[in-house]
Amino acid sequence: MIYVENKDLVIPGEVLADDEYYSGRGTFKENGKICSSLMGLVSLRNKKIRVIPLKSKYVPKKGDVVIGKIKDVRFSMWDVDINSPYSGILPAFEVFGREKKELNKVFDVGDVLFLRVVDVDEVKKVKLGLKGRGMGKFRGGIIVDITPTKVPRLIGKKGSMINMIKDKTNCKIIVGQNGLVWVKGEEDMEQLTKDIIHMIEAEAHTSGLTNKVKNKLSLAIDGELPQEDDYSDDYEELEKPKLQNFKEELEQEEKEEQSKKDSTDFYKVIEELKKKNKKDKPLSYGNNSGNSYILNNR
């Protein structure tokens, strides 16, 4: 039995379903029930239930693009705040190669950069780099901070949401996977874009958000609502790829469980045969070919 619906807001400890469902991330099992371990939104797929956190900290991964702020300049590197519990470092050789320059003449404390995560070691030491299109120091503009888990909603399917905002406001917008967003344009458009971004963050779990954003932009810029278009909402599409291999995972788990069961059943049969043989002599059982297998009764 299921006690919640898809996209319901739940709190820690709330009962979600009976254990005929599969427990996913953000849930735990207790007394035959699946419960939420955090505050978030229910996601149901193929009898698997999980809870997507409303707020979470950014955990860096190799290859991520992030926005960071220089917080210290050292002898051979910069310390960078990447909006995460884990601090980043930008080594000088990632910028200069073998050249030697005074670091604070290139990037100083307070500078905001667009960077790539080059590596993350086992203790979460984050190495950053500047290789890639558009990487480097931002000049002007504002930084908007959102929950990292809402970044896919801001971008939209194939960039649909973020491109719509860019087109209407004529602002340059760069989104970091760590939840920091750089916006540059006319001052009033920067503020409008900031408001729109926070609206998307607050209503990321709702349906019809694309149309809401389009209407707000049109009212603010054109003074009227746009003509009605059939804008499909992209929320469901963003969730699908994460669970595409769920069936394969279940089949693999079932095979492993069956293998363990078969192995256990075999040894149970052998133990039963040993118990039935009360005389101190070997047990034997045969196969169709006439061969016998001997088990020492010890």
Swiss-Prot record:
Subcellular location: Cytoplasm
Species this chain originates from: Methanobrevibacter smithii (strain ATCC 35061 / DSM 861 / OCM 144 / PS)
Keywords, sorted A to Z: Cytoplasm, Exosome, RNA-binding
Lineage: Archaea, Methanobacteriati, Methanobacteriota, Methanomada group, Methanobacteria
GO biological process, any: poly(A)-dependent snoRNA 3'-end processing
InterPro entries cross-referenced by the UniProt entry: Exosome_RNA_bind1/RRP40/RRP4, KH_dom, KH_dom_type_1, KH_dom_type_1_sf, NA-bd_OB-fold, Rrp4, RRP4_N, RRP4_S1
Protein name as annotated: Exosome complex component Rrp4
Its biological purpose: Non-catalytic component of the exosome, which is a complex involved in RNA degradation. Increases the RNA binding and the efficiency of RNA degradation. Confers strong poly(A) specificity to the exosome.
The keyword Cytoplasm belongs to this UniProt entry's keyword annotation: yes
NCBIfam families in alphabetical order: PRK04163.1-1
Assembly and binders: Component of the archaeal exosome complex. Forms a trimer of Rrp4 and/or Csl4 subunits. The trimer associates with a hexameric ring-like arrangement composed of 3 Rrp41-Rrp42 heterodimers.
Gene Ontology CC annotations of this record: cytoplasm; exosome (RNase complex)
Compositionally biased residues, Polar residues: 285-298
Residue numbers spanned by region Disordered: 276-298
Similarity field: Belongs to the RRP4 family.
One of the record's GO molecular function terms: poly(A) binding
CDD domains named among the record's database cross-references: KH-I_Rrp4_prokar (cd22524), S1_Rrp4 (cd05789)
Domain named S1 motif: residues: 63-131
Chief location category: cytoplasm
Domain KH, residue spans: 139-197
